[in-house]
Amino acid sequence: MAMFLDTEAKVSKLKKGRRKLWPLPGAPREKQTNVFKFPTDGNDSDEDTNTNSGSSSDGEDGLLTSSGSDSVFNSTDYFSTPEDSQNCTPSDVSDLSDSENLDFKPADVLHDSENSTSPKFITSLVSSDSENSGADSSEEEIEEFIKSKAKQSLQLDAKTEEITSEEDCCVQEDSYDSDGDDVEAFIRQRAEMAITKHKTKRTISTSDDEGPRKSRKKRASKRISSSDDSEDETPKTKMTGTPPLAGNSCYVWPWLN
């Protein structure tokens, strides 16, 4: 009805209090966002709470008038950092290395011929024993100690070589004996099988062989004769050159048989 009246209709205009992002017509305006607060520990001091409250209020004010950017949290006070991991100190490493050295057994190393004959192995033994004995040991004692260790290592090498050679000889003899026994048993089995086959062939008589052969020949001849008779009895159909068009019912079509 307002179109027929001279008075202008009153239109309620929306109040736009939010600030535009750009000074352009139709530009988007700032939006309000909801803020989530992470729970904090109750044992914090009053100073921390005051600083947190101040920063949170400032953050809320800024977030309420944010420009829609990806930065939601302006402060890192709400995040709880994990506890620092316990780092391994050099003292712990030294303790572990000492415990490993105590568990080391040099008896296993002496059995290896290569390590025992090498000069590096002898010098390592001498250095370890000299450190334990102290700095007051004389040069003569060290030389005697080196000679004794070298003799012991050589004796151990000779003993280990003798033991290994004896074991190898025993193993080879056992293997040869077992192989020989297996071969002899195999030969005997083959000979017995050949003898039994030859005996069974001799026991079969020629008359027994001729009987089934004759019966087989008779059966085969009967089958051949019966097949010939059946072929003679059945009349063979003769095909004409061209089939009649009509009036001849005696014509035998090939697909009917």
Curated annotation (Swiss-Prot):
Compositionally skewed regions (Polar residues) per UniProt: 72-94, 115-126
Listed transmembrane segments: none
Feature: compositional bias, Acidic residues: 163-178
Annotated stretches, region: Disordered: 1-178, 194-248
Positions with biased composition (Basic residues): 12-21
Composition bias, Basic and acidic residues: 102-114
Stretches with biased composition (Low complexity): 50-71, 127-136
Family that this chain belongs to: Belongs to the herpesviridae BKRF4 family.
Protein name from the UniProt record: Uncharacterized gene 45 protein
Organism the protein comes from: Saimiriine herpesvirus 2 (strain 11) (SaHV-2)
